[in-house]
Amino acid sequence: ELFTGGARQFTVMGKDAKPDLAELATKIDVSGARGVHSVQPAVISISNLTELGARLSCADISAYSDLAKSRGMKLFMDGARFANAVAAGSDSPADLTWRSGVDAISFGATKNGAMAAEALIFFNPGESKLS
C-alpha cells in the first residue's frame, strides 16, 4: 500500500480458482463503500489458465468484463499461461482477450527462459499512456 497510494489487492475464491462473480461484486462494493475516504477499486485481474489449471471460457471472461464495466473498472489478464488456454480450446487469442472485454494483458517471458522480458498489451491504445 505504501508505494501505490493506498491501493490493495484482495483475493476472491471460487471453483477451480475462478473468482466467484457474486462474491467479487460484493467485495468491490464493500471496498468502495467509504467513497472518497478510501481507495476505489479500479481493476479486476484474472489469469487464464487459472492457478489451478482451469480454462476461462469467453463467456467467463465476458462476465468478469461486464462486472468490471458496470463498476467503472478495467479488466486485466495475466497471460503467464495464456498459450495453454489457447491450446486447450478452439477460441482464438482475440476471442479470449479483447473480444471478450479484456482491456490489457501481460506476458512475462521469464518463465520461459528469457531474462527480464515482459510485455504489456493495451487493447485501447489511448490507455497505454501514464497520466
Give the predicted meaning of each segment:
Residues 1-131:
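Conserved PLP-enzyme active-site core in the AAT-like
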